[in-house]
């Protein structure tokens, strides 16, 4: 029998989501696994829209397409899945965004070790009682069952054999595959071990999946053992948090619930008091807020295609569910700020990209609110004729022309007890698809299509740029003004393919060269060079003359641009070497940009580089520059290069023979870019910024050479302007700004306190206007010029003065000159609540008369509206309704 988790391990088990994640990664790091940062939600695999599983970044390694980053690895991978989007919020465990904790073995340990560690982690680190655990194995995997039974000690009755559909993993119809074993948590172990049904979602939740990749499946379905067997595992962070935090669903864990509470506060509702429909809306908002924040952080923008459409759909679902809760003002930015605050610890990139995230949320929400307003007007016109059904054509027009979601049309129609012709909608949708398909046939080739068309017919371009900056070449193909052509004339925008070129084509993070092509009375200004496979494409404009396929031209690189790019590229190599020396020898490159006037280097690192470390790095690099190291460049076999210690980038594909750039004693890297001959040519190096771009990925931006002087001059000018403005010497500026900040902070606090006191003071004069209704004190009054928090304070103060029988309703315009914003607050005493009147429910109904809604707690609630002209009538209705509802004796 498996040993029970010790009481000490259970007592000290991690509980917060942050601790659960860190405990997993530390557990496997202590067992020789390299900690890998989460990859982007935008995968490198072009066949996959979004990162949907923890193993996806390692798929090329599992398939033998890339070398392994280490024998063992562990990660917490950001994932997005939208295939079950309609179940989000309705079930306990469906999400769009989630984190998958994983440990991976690439030809290293296998089944027994994976099982033993999974059990040790679950019972000893997480402190789960083995009596709460059940495991599943593939029906034919006798080895896994034997390990669970004889090595780990699990009761045979709690080892369940499952079919291939549940417990056999495959990357596709052919290729690596193997059985898997899953660990389930049993919420009701008291029901016993007989007749266990793992499909009982109320009793069991699967939280850890172990995949044993041990076979290769051929086209005929035959399985043969793999030479190198792999382990791929996944543990849902949110699921483990639900188990350890002992909450009824994933949404009520500390990974999501703070966002649900933020949304509830915006809607002035109490999550615990809501019905299932209201709770579902809050869960959708909480879940989707995490998803959209991470998607935008990783570079997705809202659109009608691909990832952009997924983002747009999620954003619009958040807005729609907010409206269902009575939130009728823009609130995505507020939810975005809450999500950033919640995620920033594990995903610092959201802080660095905060401005981008919030701007995209604001822009897309504003666009959708305009859409909703237009669509609601049209829908109101349709409903005004009191139809029994909204036709499919009408619903499709709302969807296609106004972007009005079908589900929102259904919800509004349902409120009016009207149906929507869904079959007719599908017919209209299919007709539109067919029209789009027919139209697509006649669309002209895009520029990229044209480039790929002409480049696809050409052999690889011979690159001469390592040894020469000008070279005679023959024009092989032309794209003129976006279309393939055989000739070009002055003024034309062109893409030119040459048989050979000294121009460096953009690649390896380095931008393409600039320069010119010239011939007899012909000049082409080249402003960029890209690559289409191995063909170099020179883009620019015809400055003079005529150019034709077959012409000979002199290709000349802009020497100044090349020198600056070379200096920045070599400086990037020195930067990586310095990071390894100062911060961590295990630091690996995650990306880079080498431009003419700046450089950027992204690298795997779990924490920010400190100011002291940045200073050390700068000093080290400038020292190497001053030492005037001569670079050595040579080609060699990939295995020989790696054996010599050359640094390669994980995920990059390399040929059998590679180019090695060596700064002797400092840096050795596989690199196809251009470099200085001697480090002294770089001149100077200066770091200008360090930031986080994603979980576990940091970025350093820097300048080198003449750009350093330009940067320092610019900074000096800023310091001079600040000194003039503050009438201070440069050394005094920081102290002056700090003092001003403290003064501003103190003034803000004093102003807020004064406003709150003023609101309570204004309200104090209203207490005398209360009227007796039986044993109750009824007060309904107007108080303009006070914001929501102040109005709540005033209402609560009045209720306290009037006692347990107080029924207080205060309404007003925060800005008396703006009729577009109304605030209503209700504060009820204990006796009023005992009389079955609740502030939250009551004020929401009154606010509808002002074109709004809201709610809150039984004793205190706030609502809003958009029609200030209706406020007097709404307050009169509140007075009469309360007077009628309060018991008279």
Swiss-Prot record:
Its EC number is 6.1.1.7. It holds the Pfam family tRNA-synt_2c. One of its GO terms (cellular component) is cytosol. NCBIfam families: alaS. One of its GO terms (biological process) is alanyl-tRNA aminoacylation. The lineage of its organism: Bacteria, Bacillati, Cyanobacteriota, Cyanophyceae, Synechococcales. The keyword Aminoacyl-tRNA synthetase applies. GO terms for molecular function: alanine-tRNA ligase activity; aminoacyl-tRNA deacylase activity; ATP binding; tRNA binding; zinc ion binding. It comes from Parasynechococcus marenigrum (strain WH8102). Its cofactor is Zn(2+). Gene3D superfamilies: 2.40.30.130, 3.10.310.40, 3.30.54.20, 6.10.250.550, Bira Bifunctional Protein, Domain 2, Threonyl-trna Synthetase, Chain A, domain 2. It is an enzyme of class 6 (ligase). SUPFAM superfamilies: Class II aaRS and biotin synthetases, Putative anticodon-binding domain of alanyl-tRNA synthetase (AlaRS), ThrRS/AlaRS common domain, Translation proteins. The gene is alaS. Its main location: cytoplasm. This is Alanine--tRNA ligase.
